[in-house]
C-alpha cells in the first residue's frame, strides 16, 4: 500500500480554524487545539446571542412604549388592546420610534 501524507488537507483545515480565530487573544488565536475549542464556543455564542438580541430589542421597545403611554395615564396593555380593536397594526419597533420622535402623532394613536 502506498503511503498517504495528509499534509495539505490537515494544513488547510487548521488554517481555516486559525483564520476564524485570528482576532482572539493569546493562545486562542495561535495554538490549534485551543483555537478550535474557542472557535466552536464563539460560534455557539454568536448563534445564541442573535436570538437574545431580538428579545432584548423587543423588551426595549415595549419599555419605551409603556413609558410614553403612561404619560397619558394608560398602560401598555390597554394601549395595545385599543390599537388592535381599532385595527391599527403597527409593530412595536415602529410604535417605539413614533413615541420617541413624534409625541403628537403618538398621542393621536392613543386617542387623546
Curated annotation (Swiss-Prot):
GO terms for biological process: ribosomal large subunit assembly; translation. InterPro entries: Ribosomal_bL20 (IPR005813), RIBOSOMAL_L20_CS (IPR049946), Ribosomal_protein_bL20_C (IPR035566). Keywords: Chloroplast, Plastid, Ribonucleoprotein, Ribosomal protein, RNA-binding, rRNA-binding. GO terms for molecular function: rRNA binding; structural constituent of ribosome. PROSITE patterns: RIBOSOMAL_L20. Its main location: plastid. It holds the Pfam family Ribosomal_L20. GO terms for cellular component: chloroplast; ribonucleoprotein complex; ribosome. It is found in: Plastid, Chloroplast. Coiled coil: none annotated. The keyword Manganese does not apply. It comes from the Eukaryota. The keyword Mitochondrion does not apply. Belongs to the bacterial ribosomal protein bL20 family. HAMAP family: Ribosomal_bL20 (MF_00382). PANTHER family: 39S RIBOSOMAL PROTEIN L20. Binds directly to 23S ribosomal RNA and is necessary for the in vitro assembly process of the 50S ribosomal subunit. It is not involved in the protein synthesizing functions of that subunit. This is Large ribosomal subunit protein bL20c. The gene is rpl20.
Amino acid at each position: 500500500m502506498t503511503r498517504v501524507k495528509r499534509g495539505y488537507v490537515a494544513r488547510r483545515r487548521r488554517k481555516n480554524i486559525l483564520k476564524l480565530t485570528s482576532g482572539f487573544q493569546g493562545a486562542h488565536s495561535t495554538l490549534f487545539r485551543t483555537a478550535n475549542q474557542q472557535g466552536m464556543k464563539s460560534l455557539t455564542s454568536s448563534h445564541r446571542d442573535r436570538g437574545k438580541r431580538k428579545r432584548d430589542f423587543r423588551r426595549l421597545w415595549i419599555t419605551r412604549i409603556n413609558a410614553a403611554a403612561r404619560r397619558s395615564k394608560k398602560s401598555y396593555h390597554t394601549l395595545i388592546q385599543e390599537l388592535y380593536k381599532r385595527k391599527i397594526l403597527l409593530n412595536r419597533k415602529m410604535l417605539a420610534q413614533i413615541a420617541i420622535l413624534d409625541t403628537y402623532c403618538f398621542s393621536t394613536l392613543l386617542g387623546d
